[in-house]
Amino acid sequence: MIGAVNSVEAVITSIQGLSGSPEDLSALHDLLRGAQDSLRAEPGVNFSTLDQLDASKHSLGYLYFLEVLTCGPVSKEKAAYEIPIIARFINSCDAGQIRLASYKFVSLCKILKDHVIALGDPLRGVGPLLNAVQKLQVSSKRLTALHPDVLQLCLQAKSYKSGFSILSDDIVEIDQPRDFFLYSYYGGMICIGLKRFQKALELLYNVVTAPMHQVNAIALEAYKKYILVSLIHNGQFTNTLPKCASTAAQRSFKNYTGPYIELGNCYNDGKIGELEALVVARNAEFEEDKNLGLVKQAVSSLYKRNILRLTQKYLTLSLQDIANMVQLGNAKEAEMHVLQMIQDGQIHALINQKDGMVRFLEDPEQYKSSEMIEIMDSVIQRTIGLSKNLLAMDESLSCDPLYLGKVGRERQRYDFGDDFDTVPQKFSM
């Protein structure tokens, strides 16, 4: 049982009296840390205890009690009861107070995520966790431990737009590498769901090129999707990894992603029949990876790539000619592909329904409209912001004792002294 000093009533009274100034909150935090083991062992602590606290005013104390009440084995009934309580707390709590015990807040939010997944209702957790991210973030540039969890719920709920709302900020501060890997991987999948393939490529690229001593499962899955999205969006596959990719990635990716590399090489050859035959042969592997839908989009994009090539050679073509040249079944299929490409802005063309002729046009965009100027200005401002972030990171590194110590040790290995020739001595051979 809890002693007189740490009785539940005494803790409640302390929470009510010490939830004001920063100094009081610091003292309260020390008290709660000392009392948490006793609170877990106290049978008198139950959800009705929370009625004595205001979640918005006493957020720190409320968090400690809520963590005690939600720990342990979970049944579906317990999960269903706890979800609204946790969600209400997340939505109403004070950001400044919960940041004092951010690890507990993260743990509570992960409990909520597990609860909604267990009940098969991931959408129920999306809103509260989006609020949790905003409250936990000190800066929009910082990646929190909750970013991957939000994106995971959005993927399971197919609420892609909600997930995309936290992908627009440029992240420059990261605590745990695993959070970054998952954030970029799940974020890439969110963008694929929205068909924002350029952004998906950026995020998957971050996973593929991230520093790693040995390849992890997240990076391997990201590379598979990176290949497929490259085919869909860029219409080509590059067999060589970016130079900034780690040695582990350079060495291992090709060994574990053979079917995808084979698919990319076949795509580059431009022979649709061979590509479709390869997809049939490797169908089970693509389906096991849950990438068959993307593979089919890649095959479809080869038709579009071949149609795009025709626009560079011809001014007019019949739909039947297009079907024959790109190996489509009939003129109707060719018309569907051309219309989709016009809608996506990939080509500019007019289809004459009377004679089935397609007239290819020049790009009407003259880059003079107010909308285009706004887009260009936005890109310039983002670039300026990134430049400032890089300068700030460089200055921070230059003052970091650990970094300076490492640089000093490395420099000593190659410091030969002033009396050593700077140019190697030449010998006649």
From Swiss-Prot:
PROSITE patterns: PCI. One of its GO terms (cellular component) is COP9 signalosome. The keyword Cytoplasm applies. It is found in: Cytoplasm; Nucleus. Its main location: cytoplasm. Residues 196-365 form the PCI domain. The keyword NADP does not apply. SMART domains: PINT. One of its GO terms (biological process) is red, far-red light phototransduction. Keywords: Cytoplasm, Developmental protein, Nucleus, Phytochrome signaling pathway, Signalosome. SUPFAM superfamilies: Winged helix' DNA-binding domain (SSF46785). Belongs to the CSN3 family. Component of the COP9 signalosome complex (CSN), a complex involved in various cellular and developmental processes such as photomorphogenesis and auxin and jasmonate responses. The CSN complex is an essential regulator of the ubiquitin (Ubl) conjugation pathway by mediating the deneddylation of the cullin subunits of SCF-type E3 ligase complexes, leading to decrease the Ubl ligase activity of SCF. It is involved in repression of photomorphogenesis in darkness by regulating the activity of COP1-containing Ubl ligase complexes. Component of the CSN complex, probably composed of CSN1, CSN2, CSN3, CSN4, CSN5 (CSN5A or CSN5B), CSN6 (CSN6A or CSN6B), CSN7 and CSN8. In the CSN complex, it probably interacts directly with CSN1, CSN4, CSN6 and CSN8. Interacts with COP10. This is COP9 signalosome complex subunit 3. The gene is CSN3.
